[in-house]
Amino acid sequence: MILLQKPKPKHSVMKHKQTLFSMLLLSLVSATPLCSNAQSALDKFHMELGLGTGTPKDKMTPFGANIDLNYSLTNRFSLHALSEGTYFIPKDGMTHKYNQAINLGGGLSYTILPPTIENNDAFELRASVTSTIGSSDFKNTAYKLGLYWVGNPKSRFSPVVGVGYSFHDFRTKGLNNYHGLYVSIGDRF
């Protein structure tokens, strides 16, 4: 036995669409105040792209690029998620796949001199720890402590310059640990 359904009248389908449209419109209107809060929450996130180098040691100089995603917990404290690609360039200047390392890690920063009305610059003290992922002849755990200048941190694009001390604890036999001064320049978005 086959049961046949009656076709729905057109006014019922139209009523259903109107109800659905009204609910969608109401949800958008009620979410409008939340968008302003989300925008202020997004203002706490920043991304930095940078280049850095260190002083030569044992005929080797580190040079690399980094990506730093940071979140401001308060006006002074920030959390950082870091990714660094570093080449350990020997004295002859040759770069090979085996003398590079990609490190992931995190860190903390404290704004020691926040921006003021007269001066838009800020100075941050940062500490970070990263460790090599994947296979590399230069596997290491890197520890950094530095002072960073951030030009106008309230702007969407700000220059960032850092100087500090870096220590790389190599896990490969035959490699001496690296320690020395480093300089970093970049841009904050």
Residue ranges and their predicted role:
Residues 35-86, 184-188:
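Short glycine/proline- and aromatic-enriched beta-strand/turn motifs that initiate or cap beta-hairpins
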Residues 105, 112, 177-189:
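Outer-membrane beta-barrel "beta-signal"
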Residues 40-43, 51, 100, 160-163, ...:
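First exposed extracellular module after export/assembly in secreted or surface-exposed proteins
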Residues 68-157:
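Gram-negative (and chloroplast) outer-membrane scaffold detector with strong preference
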Residues 52-63, 92-98, 131-142, 169-178:
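Solvent-exposed loop/turn segments connecting transmembrane beta-strands
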Residues 1-43, 189:
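Cleavable N-terminal export/targeting peptides
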Residues 162-170:
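Short, highly charge-biased, low-complexity peptide segments
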